[in-house]
Amino acid sequence: MAARLHFSLGPRLAGLPLSRRGSVAPLRHGFGSAVVTAPPAEDEDFATAADLQFEPPLKVVKYPDPILRARNKRINTFDDNLRSLTDEMFDVMYKTDGIGLSAPQVGVNVQLMVFNPAGVKGEGEEIVLVNPVVYKMSKRLLVYEESCLSFPGIYANVVRPDNVKIDAQDVTGAKIKVKLSGLSARVFQHEFDHLQGILFFDRMSLDVLESVREGLKDLEKKYEESTGLAMLKILSPVLLEQVLAVFQNILLSFTLKIVY
C-alpha cells in the first residue's frame, strides 16, 4: 500500500459505521468475501527454495502483470534467505514511499507481507507476517481512501472492517496471534488481499471503480507497450466466488423444481 492513505471522508464521517452513511454505494462484488481466510495447506502448497529466490534490487510489480493474480504459496523454511527477502522488501517499501508491501508485489509468489504504518525507516513499528490467516473481523465497516504501489497514481475509497484478528508466523517461524485496528488493520487487509490474488479495485463500488477506470486503462496500455504482451484477463477471485455462487443457486433451484 502506498503512503498516501487519506481519511478522505473527514474524521467525523470516516469514523461512522457504514450503515449510517447513506451516500456510500454497495460494493462492486459484495462485502461477504472482503477478508478471505486461507484453507489448510497441503504439502504441494508450500514454497520451494526456488520459489523464494530473488535478485536484489527488487522492483515493484505494476498492474496488470499476471504475477499479481498468481497463487501464492505458504512458507515453511525460515532461514537467512527469508530474512534477507523481508529486509529487501522494507527497503523497496520505504524508497517508494509505501507503508505496506506484499511479496507478490516484488515478484515472489509466497505468503509474506511487511508493513510499517509510519512509512519512515526508524520510526513506528516494522511488522512482518508470514502465512497470515484471518480468524475474526469486526462488523464495523469504514471507508478510507487507499492507494497501491502496484497502481501508481490511482487513489480511491475502499470499504473494510475496522479491526481484524490474525494467526500468523514471524520471520523466525514462531506462531503469533495479532489484533490490529485502525490504520494497521487497513494496511494489513490491503496486503492480505494481495496474497489471495485480490487487487484493491476488486473492492471498489461501481461508482468508485468508474472514477478510476481511465487510470486502469492507462496502466494496461503502458504494460502492453513495455512488454509487447496483450493484457491477460484474469478473473478476480472475489468475482469468481460470486459467479460460482450464482451458478450453485441456479443449479439448486433447478434441482428443487425437478424433485417437487
List the predicted regions and their residue ranges:
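Active-site rim/adjacent substrate-binding subdomains
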Residues: 2-189, 194-260
